[in-house]
């Protein structure tokens, strides 16, 4: 995955998310040069402790499950797999494993609230990173890993499978197929040219409450994290502090015979790293989430509830910024029922 997955793990660590050690090495087998390989860390105790966490179980879904998650395939925790199974099945560790497994199972079955089961700040950061870097493969339910933090009793994401797919080429003014969508576009206004499957559908568990209404707390966190990772200060600092490493890695990739990902096939292709592409992506996201308009009267509602004037702001999903009410004029002596402004 060229340098994209390396950036993915580095940015995850930058935001306090558990990220894998990931580097590039030249491989020779029995004296035969095999070219450049990516070396990726596994999911052991060392990963957790290096990330300054208490040792806890890490879960994944069976890789062979359909990518059309979140669908009808989730029935119970038989779909879950824990790393270092022998260790966690020991008598002295089993209670932590059981508690964690039950909580994750109940969350996916809709019996546990997001805030009670997941560290929402870490997950909002993780989704924001995947939006910025186009690493949507890492947001699939079967791709991301779930670390149970026994201190807070909640799950954190472990960055994994941060693959930037073939339908996310570098920005170019002549490229009419440039993908400017973010996760909310997929969930509410998605274009099947860019998201032909339903693999991100499970993220509704983050953005919608059980009554299918917007989870405003998580939504606000997600927008805050998007603002952070797309800010000029964050992106420039992140890239400039790693400029030497980025140049070294790309020089090795450019000199290697790399294969291009065509989803179902692979073959020779063209790759180059573009800082301007990331800068354009960040600007595109900022524009989306800051969109303001005064032309949505049907989405603002006012009324009296418990002797208080209540202004309700209804989110219109093709725009992500809150609608700001700058002035309220009441032309009635009394408000007897809810009246739309």
Question: What positions do the PLM features span?
Answer:
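Internal "kinase-insert"/substrate-recognition segments embedded within catalytic cores
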Residues: 15-20, 32-125
